[in-house]
Amino acid sequence: MFAIIETGGKQYKVKEHDIIRIEKLNASVGEEVTLSKVIALTGVDNEVIFTQNASVTASVLEQCRNDKVIIFKKKRRKNYRRKNGHRQYMTVLRITKINNME
């Protein structure tokens, strides 16, 4: 059984015991979080079930930052160069349970 969840403006296909990296959540390490925006579920024989009351429970493993992304702007012949960097805050989750409340 797997679920498709949405968090941080992105969609993730998850199963139980999966480890995913998502946009930062306000939760401390070891805390249980519930992701309630479930788009689709699969049941036995991989048929798709659409449920409104489904949720996914996960535990927070780590709060970290992603790799640095370099932003570089240049206008030729004008001596205009700008270099900037950005590191996005991330949360690492372990999916513990997929709740199907029909």
Curated annotation (Swiss-Prot):
Keyword hit for Aminoacyl-tRNA synthetase: no
Keywords: Ribonucleoprotein, Ribosomal protein, RNA-binding, rRNA-binding
Any one annotated GO CC term: ribonucleoprotein complex
GO BP: any one term: translation
Leader sequence segment: none
Family: Belongs to the bacterial ribosomal protein bL21 family.
Subunit-structure text: Part of the 50S ribosomal subunit. Contacts protein L20.
Protein name: Large ribosomal subunit protein bL21
Lineage: Bacteria, Pseudomonadati, Pseudomonadota, Alphaproteobacteria, Rickettsiales
